[in-house]
């Protein structure tokens, strides 16, 4: 009896270790947790009322994302090192006429405004989600994340991680072109 009690912690440890190794092997084979599809894909952007990041007291609602043309909703924060890495590419997309709306997520307003002044502002509009409620409604679990929203306000794609040239060309641009054509008809 005493021996069985002593073996129980070892057995539990071995089971946990096996489960961890199994998950690591899955990730190595391409089961990337950042590729999880959003539960909101194919559904309208959740209703919201958020303050402008740069103009305190000015509020926007979800309709700002439903202006007949596609838009990228980029979730970012100054505390996010990957957001800094993707920022230059977002500036390039904006310079090409891609409409990007920024959602500053759980961040300090003054730091965020200073960040945009320092690194450039790719956002046609910057919204402040200081309490993270819209992020929660969108299923955001970190920053950066980027959502492609069609001209009717339907979420068509979610990308977790930095938006770079490879991701844009292979994943987002084909969808952007498709929904841009649909909006033009």
UniProtKB/Swiss-Prot annotation:
Residues 39-177 form the Thioredoxin domain. Residues 26-185 are periplasmic. GO terms for cellular component: outer membrane-bounded periplasmic space; plasma membrane. The chain crosses the membrane at residues 5-25. Its main location: membrane. It is a single-pass membrane protein. Involved in disulfide bond formation. Catalyzes a late, reductive step in the assembly of periplasmic c-type cytochromes, probably the reduction of disulfide bonds of the apocytochrome c to allow covalent linkage with the heme. Possible subunit of a heme lyase. NCBIfam families: dsbE (TIGR00385), PRK15412.1 (NF011941). This is Thiol:disulfide interchange protein DsbE. It comes from Salmonella typhi. The gene is dsbE1.
């Amino acid at each position: 009896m005493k021996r069985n009690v002593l073996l129980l912690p070892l057995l539990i440890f071995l089971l946990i270790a096996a489960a961890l190794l199994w998950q690591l092997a899955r990730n190595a084979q391409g089961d990337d947790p950042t590729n999880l599809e959003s539960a909101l894909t194919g559904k309208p952007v959740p209703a919201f009322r958020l303050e402008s990041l740069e103009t305190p007291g000015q509020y926007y609602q979800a309709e700002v994302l439903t202006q007949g043309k596609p838009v990228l909703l980029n979730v970012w924060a100054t505390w996010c090192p990957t957001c800094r890495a993707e920022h230059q590419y977002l500036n390039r997309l904006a310079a090409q006429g891609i409409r990007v709306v920024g959602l500053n997520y759980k961040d300090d307003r003054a730091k965020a405004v200073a960040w945009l002044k320092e690194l450039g502002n790719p956002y046609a509009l910057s919204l402040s989600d200081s309490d993270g409620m819209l992020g929660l409604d969108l299923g955001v679990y970190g920053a950066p994340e980027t959502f492609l929203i069609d001209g009717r306000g339907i979420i068509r794609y979610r990308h977790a991680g930095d938006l770079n040239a490879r991701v844009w060309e292979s994943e987002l641009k084909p969808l952007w072109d498709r929904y841009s054509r649909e909006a033009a008809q």
